Amino acid sequence: MTTPRPSGLPSPYASDGSSANLADILERVLDKGVVIAGDIKINLLDIELLTIKLRLVVASVDRAKEMGIDWWESDPALSSRARGSELARENADLQRRIAELEGRTV
């Protein structure tokens, strides 16, 4: 059973031709996700000088994770957890190198 909305509030997914405000549009975009793709090529006398491939994904964090996009979790500049794992890896590497050097001097 659905609860009726108060008469003054429009449905965010209304399809009766009513205009949507910015918040409704943003909610839809973040909920569903939008992909914008484009290529820019610069040629001079049939010689390709530059190719730029643009891919833009606009989505909520939850939707991005559902799509398998989670690069911010492993980027040390963006995630404290990634910095911790990087620090632990560097620490283990330094300990291994110290053990090797101590083994050579004995």
Swiss-Prot record:
It is found in: Gas vesicle. Induction: Gas vesicle production is induced by growth conditions that promote production of secondary metabolites tiancimycin A and B. The keyword Cell wall biogenesis/degradation does not apply. The keyword tRNA-binding does not apply. One of its GO terms (cellular component) is vesicle membrane. Keywords: Gas vesicle. It holds the Pfam family Gas_vesicle. Belongs to the gas vesicle GvpA family. This strain probably produces some gas vesicles from the probable gvpO-gvpA-gvpF-gvpG-gvpJ-gvpL-gvpS-gvpK operon; it can be induced to produce more under certain growth conditions. A minor component of the gas vesicle, might be involved in nucleating gas vesicle formation. Gas vesicles are hollow, gas filled proteinaceous nanostructures found in some microorganisms. It is not clear what function gas vesicles perform in soil bacteria. This is Gas vesicle protein J. It comes from Streptomyces sp. (strain CB03234). The gene is gvpJ.
